Amino acid sequence: MKFVIVTGLSGSGKSETMRALEDMGFYCVDNLPPALITKFAELCYQPNSSIDKVALGIDIRGRKFFEALHESLNYLEKENYEYEMVYLDCNDDVLLKRYKMTRRNHPLAKDMQIPEGIKMERKIMEPLKELSTCIIDTTNMKPKDLKEEIKKIYSSGEDNPNLTISVVSFGFKHGILADADLVFDVRFLPNPYYVEELRAKTGDDKEVRDYVMNSKISEEFYVKLLDMIHFLVPQYIEEGKQHLVIGVGCTGGRHRSVTITNLIAEDLSNKGYRVVKKHRDSMLR
C-alpha cells in the first residue's frame, strides 16, 4: 500500500501534484477532513481492499483541524499504517506572482494583503513541513516540471524503490537550492568560464567535463565526495527517508556544478538507486 498525504503552501502546486498522482493510478481525495484520515486509512488497509495507492490532499483551508491532523498522524504511526507526506514549498515572490496571474485571493488574505496571508500561512504550516518525508520546492518549476518530478519520485521498478535521490546543480548567484538536504560547494574547482572556447558550453559537454576533472584536486575531491555519499545514502534509507535532495553549486551553475552532478547521478544510477538529475541554472547567463 502506498499512502501519500500531500500538503504545502497555497499556490505551490498541490492541485497539480494531485492530478499527477491521479494520472499514475492513485486514488485521490482532496481536502479530506483530518478527523476522517484514520477511518479512511482503516478502509484502505483492510485485507480485501482493492486500493493499493492513495493520495490525500490537505491544505490551509483545514487549518482549524490541524490538531485533529496531528492526532490522525499519531494514530497511523501507532497502528503501523505506513504513510508518506509530500510538502510543496515555494518562495514568497513567486507565490505572489502566481496569485496575481490567476487573480485569485489567498485563503488567509480575506482581511489582509496577499503577502501577509502568505507569511501567516508559512508560519502555520511549518510544523507540517518538519513532519514531511518529501519536500519539493516548486519555485523554479512549471506545472509540467512538477508533474515530471512527481512521476519520477513515485514510479517503480528500481532496486531501491523506497528512496528517490534528486541530484541538482545550481549557481549560487541565482540563489541557493532551498529544498536540498545536502549542499556541496564546488567553486574551488578549475573554472571553465575563464577559458574562452569553453565559456559558452556547459558541464554536459565532454570538453568542459575533462577540463574540470583534469586536476589532482578535482580527482581527490570527487573520490572523497562519493565515499561520503555512499556512506550517507544507506543511513537515510535506514531512517526511512523517501526523497533525498543533493545540491551541487558553483558560481553560475553552468560548468563545474553540472559536471559533478552528472558524475554523481551516473554513479548512483549504476548502483541501482532511483535518481532524478536536474540542472537548474545551466541555461541561464
Swiss-Prot record:
<keyword id="KW-0342">GTP-binding</keyword>
<feature type="binding site">
    <location>
        <begin position="8"/>
        <end position="15"/>
    </location>
    <ligand>
        <name>ATP</name>
    </ligand>
</feature>
<dbReference type="Pfam" id="PF03668">
    <property type="entry name" value="RapZ-like_N"/>
</dbReference>
<dbReference type="InterPro" id="IPR053930">
    <property type="entry name" value="RapZ-like_N"/>
</dbReference>
<dbReference type="InterPro" id="IPR053931">
    <property type="entry name" value="RapZ_C"/>
</dbReference>
<dbReference type="GO" id="GO:0005524">
    <property type="term" value="F:ATP binding"/>
</dbReference>
<protein>
    <recommendedName>
        <fullName>Nucleotide-binding protein CD630_34000</fullName>
    </recommendedName>
</protein>
<dbReference type="InterPro" id="IPR005337">
    <property type="entry name" value="RapZ-like"/>
</dbReference>
<comment type="function">
    <text>Displays ATPase and GTPase activities.</text>
</comment>
<feature type="binding site">
    <location>
        <begin position="59"/>
        <end position="62"/>
    </location>
    <ligand>
        <name>GTP</name>
    </ligand>
</feature>
<dbReference type="Pfam" id="PF22740">
    <property type="entry name" value="PapZ_C"/>
</dbReference>
<keyword id="KW-0547">Nucleotide-binding</keyword>
<keyword id="KW-0067">ATP-binding</keyword>
<dbReference type="GO" id="GO:0005525">
    <property type="term" value="F:GTP binding"/>
</dbReference>
<comment type="similarity">
    <text>Belongs to the RapZ-like family.</text>
</comment>
<dbReference type="InterPro" id="IPR027417">
    <property type="entry name" value="P-loop_NTPase"/>
</dbReference>
